[in-house]
Amino acid sequence: MENRRFLRTEALLGHEGMERLRGARVMVVGLGAVGGYALEALARAGVGHLTLVDFDVFDESNINRQILALSSTVGRRKTEVARERVLDINPDCDVKIIETFVNADTLPQLLAEPVDYVVDAIDALNPKCCLMETLYRNGIPFISSMGAALKTDVSRIGLRRLSRTENCSLARFVRKRLKRRGVDIGKIVRSEEHTS
């Protein structure tokens, strides 16, 4: 029987586009709220090779906002839960997991194998800046999410140049730090919503 799993994606992108997705090597760094939803979309689109990076386990407090967090996953490693979910969606996907905290010492391990694109869903300043700078200097395409805490208006989420973000303290700190290091990042995902 023909695999009908990605027929709708192929109808949208064409056969060649679907083959590009099947051959794509994408890394998702950070498997919490933003990273979990990004991973879900990548898996359901038919991306063929995924590398999942996180150091944490699920806590009960994650359940209200993280797609991978369930009563049954509390206490389990985020990478393991994510791999199981991806393989449940697409059993043909090549899934690698790396259980580590991102820093200058662990980045060589993360980037030891070729990757076509990286999704940066890290929510801590130092690892985020370290990852972004390394990807930038190595010419590896990536998208980076900025702060989403306490933001609820999805109409205010979008792409914007890091140099032009407003109302996001994480983006402000990232911008300042990377500017000092001579790193000019293009577009990032951010929310322009004001929080009280």
Task: Give the ranges of each region predicted by the language model.
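A structured beta-alpha segment of the ubiquitous adenosine-cofactor-binding alpha/beta core
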Residues: 75-116, 122-126
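Glycine-rich phosphate-binding loop and adjoining beta1-alpha1-beta2 segment
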Residues: 47, 52-90
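Conserved S-adenosyl-L-methionine
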Residues: 43-49, 137
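Conserved small/polar residues in nucleotide/adenosyl-binding loops
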Residues: 193-195
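ADP-ribose/adenylate-binding Rossmann-like module
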Residues: 117-165
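N-terminal charged helix/coil linker that caps or initiates catalytic domains
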Residues: 1-27
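Conserved N-terminal Rossmann-fold NAD(P)-binding element of oxidoreductases
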Residues: 28-30, 53
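Hydrophobic/small residue at the entry helix of a nucleotide-binding pocket
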Residues: 34-35
